[in-house]
């Protein structure tokens, strides 16, 4: 389970250093094998362990290639999926096309989201957080059933 938001840097080769608190877990659960793809709803990337990505692939394989919307989702997620292996220094090489999609340059936010990480440009991340908070504060107060049951 991944949680928290951490600022990491991309080096000149497009590698990011995985925070040490996650490295052992990634090696133990996935031998450091990861898959990165685009988020189709936000300007960020999604980073999964290979075993977790294989579950996503199974779900995608059950979508119909004859349904245009389902085919688009398959094309976007699978077509951008790129395997990356964590090296001995705990770094992951993020493909240039993926970095371009999310506007990643130097400062990157690594955001834990249960079974995956999101990778955001730092400035874009803080803009998104502000938009999310503003949306929650201006919301009409109508909550989904799941949110009504959420006690914090």
Swiss-Prot record:
Occurrences of domain SpoVT-AbrB (ranges): 5-52, 81-124
One Gene Ontology biological process: negative regulation of DNA-templated transcription initiation
Gene Ontology annotations for the cellular component aspect, listed alphabetically: cytoplasm; nucleoid
InterPro entries: MraZ, MraZ_C, MraZ_dom, MraZ_N, MraZ_sf, SpoVT-AbrB_dom, SpoVT-AbrB_sf
Pfam families: MraZ (PF02381)
Gene Ontology MF, one: transcription cis-regulatory region binding
Keywords in alphabetical order: Cytoplasm, DNA-binding, Repeat, Repressor, Transcription, Transcription regulation
Superkingdom field: Bacteria
Location in the cell: Cytoplasm, Nucleoid
Family that this chain belongs to: Belongs to the MraZ family.
Complex and partners: Forms oligomers.
PANTHER family: TRANSCRIPTIONAL REGULATOR MRAZ
Name of this protein: Transcriptional regulator MraZ
């Amino acid at each position: 389970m991944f949680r928290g938001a951490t600022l990491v840097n991309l080096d000149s080769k497009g590698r990011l250093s995985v925070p040490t608190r996650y490295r052992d877990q990634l090696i133990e659960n996935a031998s450091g094998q990861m898959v990165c793809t685009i988020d189709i709803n936000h300007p960020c990337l999604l980073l999964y362990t290979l075993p977790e990505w294989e579950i996503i692939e199974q779900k995608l394989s059950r979508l119909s290639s004859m349904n245009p919307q389902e085919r688009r989702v398959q094309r976007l997620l699978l077509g951008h999926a790129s395997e990356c292996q964590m090296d001995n220094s705990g770094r992951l090489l993020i493909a240039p096309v993926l970095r371009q999609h999310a506007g990643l340059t130097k400062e990157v936010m690594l955001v834990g989201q249960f079974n995956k990480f999101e990778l955001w440009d730092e400035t874009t991340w803080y803009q998104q957080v502000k938009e999310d908070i503003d949306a929650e504060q201006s919301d009409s107060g109508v909550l989904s059933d799941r949110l009504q049951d959420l006690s914090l």
